[in-house]
């Protein structure tokens, strides 16, 4: 290695410039890492919300045993939703604290490297390095004292990794505002009305339409449909809602599900989407039944007694209970 030949002052100046370049390079690396972490956190948002409904549905399914009333089911579903949202918020806060701790450890490692380098440098450089470290420590203490004492803070020092009560309270407040805004939008969508075309099925179809809000449950829909069907069908005059089934796209839908659940999850059945309630031609009657189309068919309102007698005959032989974990990404004709 070539030996530097010059005065002690020039050697100290050269070493100072080298340390300054190293510091700028480290700051650039920290900035790149922070940008990459923010990008990763933003990319995880959609995945969190897409997995949110499936996790709540799985928890509801595992915690419900036997027959329960509709009110108990709805209360349990809403409680699970609130608990899931609080867990996601807490997990996000823990992730942010973990990142802050990692940045703090990285800062300590950089200081340790600087300390080792300064031991090999000249006395002049050691004094300058000590003064710079003391200024950074004083700036960090001034930042932790609160916003009222920030007048003497060095604006060039990065203190984002330090704990800040006011910043955490502001983040929690913003997170709560976003949650309330999301709740308000969800309630607004639930209040929107949609026209549902269905067919009472007793071996042949008898088509009817009703208007329901998207937040209505399948049981509420069957109750409204039964009120209109009793006038025309004698076998329904003594029937109750619990004796009826709602079959959509060859799937038997549970009474406690809401239409909003299928819309948010964009759930699909064997022959079409469960989140669309307008009517198109049956895909099995088209020229090419293997072509997947975003088309919906009229759901069937059926007596359970009729289904038990005819479940070995088409079309009842195709019907099966709805399972949110089972995906029907392509149409089936068998």
Curated annotation (Swiss-Prot):
Transmembrane segments: none annotated. Pfam families: XAP5 (PF04921). Keywords: Acetylation. It comes from the Eukaryota. Widely expressed. Abundant in testis, where it is expressed in seminiferous tubules, not in the interstitium. At the cellular level, expressed in primary spermatocytes and round spermatids, but not detectable in spermatogonia, elongating spermatids, mature spermatozoa, Sertoli cells or Leydig cells. One of its GO terms (cellular component) is nucleoplasm. The modification N-acetylalanine is found at residue 2. Belongs to the FAM50 family. This is Protein FAM50B. It comes from Mus musculus (Mouse). The lineage of its organism: Eukaryota, Metazoa, Chordata, Craniata, Vertebrata. The gene is Fam50b.
